[in-house]
Swiss-Prot record:
It is a single-pass membrane protein. The gene is tatB. This is Sec-independent protein translocase protein TatB. Keywords: Cell inner membrane, Cell membrane, Membrane, Protein transport, Translocation, Transmembrane, Transmembrane helix, Transport. Its main location: membrane. Disulfide bonds: none annotated. GO terms for cellular component: TAT protein transport complex. The Tat system comprises two distinct complexes: a TatABC complex, containing multiple copies of TatA, TatB and TatC subunits, and a separate TatA complex, containing only TatA subunits. Substrates initially bind to the TatABC complex, which probably triggers association of the separate TatA complex to form the active translocon. It comes from Helicobacter pylori (strain J99 / ATCC 700824) (Campylobacter pylori J99). It comes from the Bacteria. InterPro entries: TatB. Residues 128-140, 149-160 have a biased composition (Basic and acidic residues). The chain crosses the membrane at residues 1-21. Part of the twin-arginine translocation (Tat) system that transports large folded proteins containing a characteristic twin-arginine motif in their signal peptide across membranes. Together with TatC, TatB is part of a receptor directly interacting with Tat signal peptides. TatB may form an oligomeric binding site that transiently accommodates folded Tat precursor proteins before their translocation.
């Protein structure tokens, strides 16, 4: 048990019987057995607690791994959203630039009383049609079409 053989245990028992006497010896043996059982139970409880703690540490490590994985996924999703927002921003900036170009074109045309560049093609087509129509129509009708064109141009000025 404690590195003692049978003969050594027998010597200890004989000394205990002589020292305690035959009346107190049985109670002392019961107390010693209870003490060793309590120590054994305490050691087993400590072992179980240690095993639980080790298991908790493993669970903590696993939880941290999942947390890191989750954070990485969230960051990757943020990256995707940011890229999509950047694309939308670039598209919006391009649209704003084209609208600003149109506004500048209108302002220049208003200052010089000419037709905006982007409308030149449309107007040249309309003028060609008007010339064809004007040869067949009377001067009064040609005057009406030019008045309508002037009204449309005035409406465009109001929107700007």
């Amino acid at each position: 048990m404690f590195g003692m053989g049978f003969f050594e245990i027998l010597v200890v028992l004989i000394v205990a019987i002589i020292f305690l006497g035959p009346e107190k010896f049985p109670q002392a043996v019961v107390d010693i057995v209870k003490f060793f059982r309590a120590v054994k139970k305490t050691l087993n409880d400590a072992k179980d607690t240690l095993d639980k703690e080790i298991n908790i540490e493993e669970i903590k490590k696993e939880t941290l791994e999942y947390q890191k994985l989750f954070e990485n996924k969230v960051e990757s999703l943020k990256g995707v959203k940011i890229e999509e927002l950047e694309d939308a921003k670039v598209t919006a900036e391009n649209e704003i630039k084209s609208i600003q170009d149109l506004m500048q074109d209108y302002k220049r045309s208003l200052e010089t009383n000419t037709i905006p560049n982007h409308l030149n093609e449309e107007v040249s087509n309309e003028e060609a049609l008007n010339k064809e129509v004007s040869s067949d129509e009377s001067p009064k009708e040609v005057q009406l079409t030019t008045d309508n064109n002037a009204k449309e141009h005035d409406k465009e000025k109001e929107h700007v």
